[in-house]
Amino acid sequence: MLFSSLVFLFTFLPITLLVYYLVPRKVKNVVLLIASLIFYAWGEPVYIFLMLISILFNYFCGMDIALKAGRKSQVRSLIFTIVVNLFILGFFKYYGFIVTNLNAILPFYIPYRKLELPIGISFYTFQTLSYIIDVYRGNVDVQVNLIDFGTYVTMFPQLIAGPIVQYADVERQLRERKESLTKFGYGAWFFVMGLAKKVLLANTIGSIYENIAAMDGMSVVTAWLGCLAYTFQIYFDFSGYSDMAVGLGKMFGFEFMQNFNYPYISKSVTEFWRRWHISLGSWFREYVYIPLGGNRVTVPRHLLNLLIVWFLTGLWHGASWNFVVWGLFYGVILITEKYFTGKILAKLPEAVQILYTMILVMLGWVLFFSPTLGSAFTWIGNMFGQGATGFMDSQALYLIMRNWLFWVAGIIGSTPFMHLLGKRLVFDEERPHTVLAGCLMTGLFVLCVAYLVTESYNPFLYFRF
């Protein structure tokens, strides 16, 4: 079930909100847990059992780790819990990838059956790992209430696409959060803005990318336009979904971290990754990079730490060599900026810094969206004239002229301009102009629903992760 589906907007969400606000405080988490399990089972009825097993396993392992505090056996319990969680994730996500590569080099064939990836498994596995590790470190108290722990793991606003919520950030909110009309209003605003980004921008621009990707040949300009279309699509798709998650969290009294901070205005690739998928970067920093020693080590070890983190970041996104190369691509760039080009880059005009960043990010997206490394290099070759049908052709001109409004909307929407304009029009000293906000939200919501009713193209790119 997608947030941008009609069944969610007009059936699931209204019923869940109604029941949630009617029941007493002590059973609100029960309502959230049941609703979240229904939400997940709607699209993955079989894998609901895997999620329930994960909840029970990590609940009891957390209790075990807490009881063994200060003893050597606590470390063994921690390692066991982490290994089991990673094994489950690896089995469903990387089993086929590993066997396929082994079959390519071994003299015999290993038969295997392709497994469907449980939706959201990468996200909720990282959440349970953050809980387990923080219990071991003593950063949080062990959760003894199974309902509260289950609510944390399954909470539908961020279950299938994040943001990745670390347990420490919601530990108190699970029991002591407070709902209010003001918070609900802010949540509705975030949700509708995210829905508009997803439906009106990501879906529309995404169809442009799909049309270009289906071409047999393309000019240099067409190849860049296709890459630009995907660049806009993945940002509005994922950040829109994250905004909806943050908004839904507010409606139920929670405060989740913002997952995006206008990454396409970054002046370096290092800055880009401070602004893109912030919760994932925060997770890897807290639970991988810092335990490896961070930057408080020798230069060779620091380089290795960065490459390990970015190798794992690429692998987290998918089981293919494309994602591995994509992750290492960023690892090498960040190392280069850290030790060689960072100071030089900082002296360049701001526009040049942003252009430099966007070119590298767009090249990275080619690795990301291409089905194979070969097709990625072919597309990149087209972008620089190798194998292209020419520099500019009638198809490229048509794509520019026919879709000029979406190109402009993509550029403007990637900057804080609309946010600042909305804040100025709708908010005054953090208090919303209720009538104007209501009119804007209603108008955007109606446009989104009209699109969903008439169009069938409504993918969500991060479902595969």
Regions found by a protein language model. Give the residues of each.
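Membrane-embedded transmembrane alpha-helical bundles that form the catalytic cores
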Residues: 1-464
